[in-house]
Amino acid sequence: MLDYRQRIDTLITKIEKARIAYSRHHIVKIVAVSKNASPEAIQHYYNCSQRAFGENKVQDLKIKMHSLEHLPLEWHMIGSLQENKINALLSLKPALLHSLDSLKLALKIEKRCEILGVNLNALLQVNSAYEESKSGVVPEEALETYSQISETCKRLKLKGLMCIGAHTDDETKIEKSFTTTKKLFDQIKNASVLSMGMSDDFELAIACGANLLRIGSFLFKE
């Protein structure tokens, strides 16, 4: 059985070391990616003071939210959002959508937000590793797309950027994908959230300026 307290304490120790090396004033938030975890495991981490959890699929988000509605949790949608799932996502009122990957999707979400009278906070996903398997706008188009969404959408509110580190063992390539995203982030006025770093590369992401981490297997893998 997992020792939940030990897992999260180990994670926090590693994050603290990387955070202080980057800047003593830097604040880093953990989103525990619970896509393969049971509600019981989430409850254990809640008991360890973890509050933000992320899901890859809208249906899983709905199931977890309903089964744990007695807890004051903060839910994030981190996986790709299909257009036919927009209404379902908006009805759940997540804290943040990490995976807004195009102007087209933004306009469709904005339209549904208007109809339903709700707002949605989101991050623009940047495909900073230029990988065909990944969603997101390419870095060269990121600032213009961000600006277009910000100017056009009133209920869909952009809060910053998200990227997935390059899928490789070459640390320099992973670092480049993070620094590329950080440079874009620094050029966006009022952007506050930089979601970079997962279980295998979060320390490198923090060194590149990440302030929100998406941690799954480090916390939940048996």
Curated annotation (Swiss-Prot):
The protein's organism comes out as Helicobacter pylori (strain J99 / ATCC 700824)
The record's Pfam families line, in alphabetical order, gives:
Ala_racemase_N
UniProt cross-references to HAMAP family, sorted A to Z = PLP_homeostasis (MF_02087)
Family annotation (InterPro entries): Ala_racemase_N, PLP-binding_barrel, PyrdxlP_homeostasis
What is the protein's name according to its record?
Answer: Pyridoxal phosphate homeostasis protein
What is known about what this protein does?
Answer: Pyridoxal 5'-phosphate (PLP)-binding protein, which is involved in PLP homeostasis.
Give the family per the record: Belongs to the pyridoxal phosphate-binding protein YggS/PROSC family.
NCBIfam families documented for this protein: YggS family pyridoxal phosphate-dependent enzyme
GO MF annotation list: pyridoxal phosphate binding
For this UniProt record, the keywords arranged alphabetically read as follows: Pyridoxal phosphate
N6-(pyridoxal phosphate)lysine, modified sites = 35
